[in-house]
Amino acid sequence: MEKSTVYFTDFRCPVGTSQLDKLKKLCVTAGIKNIDMDGKFVAIKMHFGELGNLAFLRPNYAKAVADLCKEQGGLPFLTDCNTLYPGSRKNALEHLECANLNGFNSISTGCQIIIGDGLRGTDEVEVPVVNGEYCQTALIGHAIMDADIFISLSHFKGHEATGFGGALKNIGMGCGSRAGKMKQHASGKPAVNEELCRGCRRCAKECGSDAITYPNKKAVIDYDKCKGCGRCIGACGFDAVYNPNSSANELLDRKMAEYAQAVCHGRPHFHVALVQDISPNCDCHGENDAPILPDIGMFASFDPVALDQACADACLKATPIENSQLGEHLAKPDWHCHHDHFKDSNPNIEWKATLDQAEKIGLGTRQYELKIVK
């Protein structure tokens, strides 16, 4: 497979310009205007942030992309699907309220918001996965599949289960209905190391399934209630909650890649990622820890696999921030350094599996040429 082209611009802005100007120029240079959008529905998939989290992308970025679509005659809308776990985005009404509270509305973004899998997270379409090994079909939000054109606008950051969350996670996990998310997460559930557990109850507060109790002042997980979402792993500050089966995370990664293929296959798609506020964990948390790496820039491509690879490569070259989860890990005298910022931040992850699987089934390629946009 030939190399894909990924376009990049940094966040430096001379007087008289803005990041929004640079984002628009990046998208235009990358070829967004080559897509025929006239009179067509354009789904812009992004994450509206959990209440309390402040690392999610600002609505201004969404408006920049939506405005470009409207200039081409497109009919854009922002979308995301409901969460698997209870929280502020578990149904469409609360999800929309959360989006509004975090600044996303028709005025701030220039387009409407549609929750992709409907009121209860059950409005889904069963979509074939071409060349799928782990999923023959994917359960995707109906409104997302109804769109003529698909654009992902992703916040690239760390993740406690997948290593990082970029375009493929935004698409694969994010576009899955609640049942689709469950099918992806079903491959593994966390465990507790009692020797490390301090009974602080942070994991129970983060759990959306009421699956964690403390009968002996140590966390105990009820696996009949646990959905395997992994939020408790990110909540624990003492590494007491962990994934006992590293292959479970790898299986999650590969399923996620196949779901992303189901979303993109057979229609025009374009992808943008902003590598900033690189928190160690998912934006699904109701909080965000300090960034583990400095802000890097914005990337765009027609190939989501190459895009994620380029973002990851840029992060791996960056210098860790000392006062962060990653910096603290690396400063430990007994820390086994993986020479991989994502794995050193969250050790029980296998992020390369997502890219490997996506490339294997033909969604894109990990080989890319990086072009700089000034």
Regions found by a protein language model. Name each.
Residues E2-Y61, E71-D80, Y85-K374:
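Extended, low-polarity segments enriched in aliphatic/aromatic residues
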